Amino acid sequence: MVLAAFGGKMAVMQPLPYKIAQSVLVVIYTDQAQVLLVQRTQGDGRGAAFWQSVTGSKDFESEPWEQVAAREVFEETGIDVYGEGCRLQDWELENIYPIYPQWLHRYAPGACMNTERVFGLQVPSYVHVTLNPREHTAFAWHAWRDAADRCYAPSNAEAILHLPAFLSA
């Protein structure tokens, strides 16, 4: 059993034996359209490490999308989405894609598609990043187009390419 608090709300969560095929992708960016990418510790199944935005699955079926986004950003980067100068926004975009074969064993039998909800997190340029060493080995800030080009997952690149529409929002 896990007790978690995000955004002033407490929740008791019972860990599930399998990952839930519902996840978030959070594009973290500055007002100058610099995008944060993190490098995964484990490779793509062929041994190659890859770059991505913050991602993560729901811990329980009814977990609200915003809570998942806040939890994953904090776990992976140490950034508090409710901190000074930060603005978390649900971009109301969803990607549905096949789960990569090398990761199917993490999901319940029969699960083959993942639904990914896209969020943006605007942060101040001085934000401090503290990586979780179990998940990531490096981070880097890139201009948004360059960041999109560096992403392993096509859905991640596509999400970053939507950034200009949200910069003025």
Features from the language model and the residues they span:
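NUDIX/MutT-family hydrolases
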Residues: 117-123, 128-160
